[in-house]
Swiss-Prot record:
Catalytic activity, reaction form: 5-aminomethyl-2-thiouridine(34) in tRNA + S-adenosyl-L-methionine = 5-methylaminomethyl-2-thiouridine(34) in tRNA + S-adenosyl-L-homocysteine + H(+)
GO BP annotations listed: methylation; tRNA wobble base modification
Cellular compartments annotated: Cytoplasm
Signal peptide residues on this chain, from the entry's feature table: none
Keywords in alphabetical order: Cytoplasm, FAD, Flavoprotein, Methyltransferase, Multifunctional enzyme, Oxidoreductase, S-adenosyl-L-methionine, Transferase, tRNA processing
Similarity-based family: In the N-terminal section; belongs to the methyltransferase superfamily. tRNA (mnm(5)s(2)U34)-methyltransferase family.
This protein's encoding gene: mnmC
Function: Catalyzes the last two steps in the biosynthesis of 5-methylaminomethyl-2-thiouridine (mnm(5)s(2)U) at the wobble position (U34) in tRNA. Catalyzes the FAD-dependent demodification of cmnm(5)s(2)U34 to nm(5)s(2)U34, followed by the transfer of a methyl group from S-adenosyl-L-methionine to nm(5)s(2)U34, to form mnm(5)s(2)U34.
Region described as tRNA (mnm(5)s(2)U34)-methyltransferase: 1-241
Start and end residues of each stretch annotated as FAD-dependent cmnm(5)s(2)U34 oxidoreductase: 289-705
Identification of the protein by name: tRNA 5-methylaminomethyl-2-thiouridine biosynthesis bifunctional protein MnmC
Single GO MF annotation: oxidoreductase activity, acting on the CH-NH group of donors
InterPro entries: FAD-dep_OxRdtase, FAD/NAD-bd_sf, MnmC-like_methylTransf, SAM-dependent_MTases_sf, tRNA_MAMT_biosynth_bifunc_MnmC, tRNA_MNMC2, tRNA_S-uridine_synth_MnmC_C
NCBIfam families, per database record: MnmC_Cterm, PRK01747.1-2, tRNA_MNMC2
Length: 705
């Protein structure tokens, strides 16, 4: 959903002032020094970082504002890395903002801090559009991960996923003064701070207001007054107390303040168990099954977190399934309501658009055209629906906007008598080249090995000897086949600590996925030859099908949807269907009627789910969960039910359907974060929507199993 941006004025000193709160964003005298003193030194960050042994240190902030606190933190963290080059932990910075600055105001505000010029440029380049939810950014070659949650803090914090060990190691309790912004400084905020706090979590804040001190103490923090910065006499700082009680309360209230759905069914809350994060070996061996867009995105996400990956796939080369089409449209599927599916699609698209552009800037090549996507209102009812979607202002204009026929014609560079929706960040991509680019990018960060002609027969867990120690590992069994020239030598057996199924349409051959209601859908795309009128097309057109601009003398026109058909042979009957759909949808465009087929194209099988959303998370042990959660239909209190059993360190990323280009990068990042124990870049509600065991839970509630 669209977030209202901040109303900003700049004073004579160039300091930004929030008109609605009548308060400055930072001190006009020395805002950077105040940030370093209040938040970094009073949280003892330099000292704690020297001794930190965990893989991640998490800072959480209650008001992002101009990003000054982040920039100061980056500067101090870089000093730490220079002085302690053996330090290996990742710094994770989570912040919230109800009224984000516009891009223009952010640039002007940060002009005052030339000492942070490089990091400020990196922030400005990644700064998100005003879209409600979590936006992930990275700095210092992935050593610092930033999650910026846009929206009301009282809505955001209950959606942060944590386990019984907590999430946050240090709080920056910032924001406008309590007297200016009393809605934020509430008991609910302090309770959430305590819920999310890890053992030893500290906090610091510039204010010394009495009700803030009392609220923090009531929530479970030890609080003390300390000397303030500059002209401010006092400030507050402290540490989480009552470790045992906090742990117990957090364990008993894992679904803290979940809203209306908590009383309706147990579907979402039980699904949340599949995002449990367990400790792994310091250097685990990772096996990814599948080498399409899901497998490549997974390898890249894991490589960014320092994992080496072995990729096993059936074919001679990667991207031979649905990811092998020469052209594919890239755009989000948005609705007139902010459903979970719409939110997932919107955030997935924004994340993917940023990632693909970053790959380009880093020198990884894949054919593409960021020409935008025009979704045509080729029927009156559709045109009306699209107009309502933009009139509601549900989605930011940077994401989608309504265009009249005249502008549509200008964007498409051809006759276009239809209004529609234009998505400027979209376009088309060569998926197979993108898959190669993702594997290449992953290989620059860690060790990535590709094993072709490896059709998985199954996995089993055994104790194996590793460096004179016994360790439980998965053994992967493959069908024997001949090695392919240029690829790694084939073996019939491999070992891994972590197994990730990113198997797409081949999921139907995986025994471990047999109990999941995956749907296989055949699709055929035409490669139609260009001609004079068609060659002018300058954007992707979507109607009941789609048509791309010219690439290598051809246009992609598609696509059919044939359920439960695993054949990939080319069919003239489906060519006729694709052409007929195109002619009918663009019946008022003469140039569109001149498009002809040439019996060239490609068919592949997509893997989808009944609710058209991916399956992302730990792989449920279906038979055990059927027994453990058999009483779900009774709708008893959550504390009654045990934690559902999952396969040990086995995960799944599949069911992307025809939206793999859009959803794969963020889904892979979510799963990689779960595996590595890092904060998850998605709200609990949305995580629950993606959980692989959601279908089983629904069946148990309905007593269908």
């Amino acid at each position: 959903m669209t977030i209202k941006t901040a109303d900003i004025q700049f004073n004579a000193d160039g300091t930004p002032i929030a008109t609605n709160f009548d308060d400055v964003y930072f001190s006009s005298f020395d805002g950077a020094a105040e940030t370093e003193y209040v938040f970094l030194h009073n949280n003892l960050l330099p000292q704690r970082w020297q001794q930190w042994s965990k893989p991640t240190f998490v800072i959480a902030e209650t008001g992002f504002g101009t990003g000054l606190n982040l920039l100061v933190t980056l500067a101090v963290f870089k000093q730490h890395l220079a002085q302690h080059p053996a330090s290996t932990f990742t710094l994770h910075y989570i912040s919230t903002e109800k009224f984000p600055l516009t891009h223009t105001d952010l640039v002007q505000a940060l002009n005052a801090f030339v000492q942070f010029e490089d990091d400020a440029k990196a922030l400005i380049a990644q700064y998100p559009m005003p879209l409600d939810g979590c936006h992930r950014m990275s700095f210092l070659n992935n050593r610092v991960i930033v999650d910026l949650w846009l929206g009301d803090i009282h809505d955001s914090l209950p959606q942060w996923h944590t386990n019984e060990n907590g999430l946050v190691d240090a709080w920056y309790l910032d924001g406008f003064a309590p007297s200016k912004n009393p809605q934020m400084w509430s008991p609910q905020l302090f309770e959430q701070m305590a819920r999310l706090a890890s053992n030893g979590c500290t906090f610091a804040t510039f204010t010394a207001a009495g009700f803030v001190k009392r609220g923090l103490r009531d929530a479970g923090f030890e609080v003390e007054k300390r000397k303030g910065h500059g002209r401010k006499r006092e400030m507050l700082a402290g540490i989480i107390a009552r470790e045992l009680e906090t742990k117990v309360n957090r364990q008993q209230a894992r679904y803290y303040q979940r809203g209306a759905y908590m009383n309706s069914t147990s579907v979402n809350t039980r699904c949340a168990e599949n995002h449990a994060q367990t400790a792994l070996a310091s250097k685990p061996k990772v096996a990814i099954i599948g080498a399409g867009i899901a497998g490549a995105s997974m390898a890249y996400a894991m490589a960014k977190k320092g994992y080496d990956c072995d990729i096993y796939f059936n074919d001679a080369t990667p991207a031979q399934g649905a990811s092998g089409n020469p052209q594919a449209g890239f755009y989000p599927q948005l609705n007139v309501d902010a459903s979970h599916a719409s939110q997932i699609n919107a955030h997935s698209f924004v994340y993917a658009a940023n990632q693909y552009r970053q790959l380009q800037s880093q020198g990884f090549h894949f054919a593409h055209q960021w020409c935008g996507v025009l979704q045509l209102g080729f029927k009156p009812a559709l045109a009306e629906r699209y107009a309502k979607l933009t009139e509601s202002q549900l989605w930011p204009g940077e994401l989608v906007r309504y265009v009249k026929p005249s502008e549509a014609a200008q964007l498409a560079n051809c006759e276009m008598p239809y209004s529609g929706l234009f998505m400027p960040l979209g376009g088309w991509i060569d998926p197979a080249q993108l898959v190669d680019a993702l594997f290449d990018a992953a290989a620059k960060l860690s060790q990535v090995r590709l094993y072709s002609h490896h059709a998985l027969n199954g996995i089993e867990q055994k104790n194996v000897s590793i460096t004179a120690q016994e360790n439980t590992r998965w053994q992967l069994h493959f069908e024997a086949s001949e090695a392919t020239s240029g690829m790694n030598k084939n073996t019939s057996l491999a070992q891994a600590d972590i197994v990730i199924y990113a198997t797409g349409a081949q999921s139907h051959d995986i025994a471990a996925l047999a109990d999941f209601p995956l749907r296989m859908v055949r699709g055929q795309v035409e490669a139609v030859p260009t001609q004079t009128a068609l060659s002018k097309l300058n954007t992707v057109l979507c109607h009941k099908g789609y048509l791309t601009p010219e690439y290598n003398g051809q246009h992609a026109l598609g696509s059919t949807y044939v359920k439960n058909d695993l054949s990939t042979d080319y069919r003239l009957s489906e060519q006729d269907k694709n052409l007929a759909t195109h002619y009918q949808s663009l019946s008022d465009c003469q140039w569109a009627q001149e498009v002809v087929g040439n019996a060239q194209g490609r068919a592949a099988v997509r893997c989808s789910s009944p609710d058209h959303l991916p399956l992302v998370g730990a792989l449920a042990d279906i038979e055990k969960q059927k027994k453990e959660l058999s009483d779900l239909y009774k709708a008893l209190p959550l504390s009654y039910y045990p934690k559902g059993s999952n396969m040990n360190n086995v995960f799944v990323l599949t069911g992307l359907g025809s939206r793999g280009l859009t959803t794969a990068p963020l889904m892979a990042e979510v799963l990689a974060s779960q595996i590595s124990g890092q904060p998850l870049p998605m709200a609990n509600d949305l995580l629950n929507t993606l959980n692989p065991n959601r279908f089983l839970i629904r069946q148990l509630i309905r007593r269908e199993v």
